[in-house]
Amino acid sequence: NREMAIHIANSARYFLPHIFALSTNSPFWEGRTTGYKSFRTKVFDKFPRTGIPDYFDSIEAYDNYIKLLVKTNCIDNAKKIWWDLRVHPFFNTVEFRICDVPMTVQETITIAALFQAICAKLYKLRSQNLNFMMYSRALLNENKWRAGRYGIDGSMIDFGKEMEVNTRVLIYELLDFVDDVLPELGSRHAINN
């Protein structure tokens, strides 16, 4: 349902920089190296309604935000929300939009399987009346910037530990976090590749 979708979207925001770091592959702009692993996001983030979304405490709050933008002629429909992740405007799903285009079919399958596993794990936690820690958009953007600049070769902030951690280590921790839902999803092989 849409209420579950907004809850999963809120929680999944934390993992966006992790998966983004795995997908970075746009280091050039106008034929020149930029020093970023993904410069595409630096360009795209200049547009409105992009980047990591705010936290919404309910689907009603999310819908009211969309209605206000439509009513005030900012957008003509919810498809004009270009966040890195959003509740799809026509389906009861969470849509992830942060990644650079993967270079291979296998990379595409792996990233899709990771997003699926994150959603399944967050759904499982919610079904057990548990929640994943919520962090502010400002903090999440720190990790997004690091992921865009350094990809998996840098470090990001582990907000729970309040320290910098190698991005690869955080990705391994993400894999451990979703491990128990992989058998049911049948996606272990896709992720292990």
Q: Where on the chain are the PLM-derived regions?
A:
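C-terminal accessory/tail domains of diverse enzymes
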Residues: 41-193
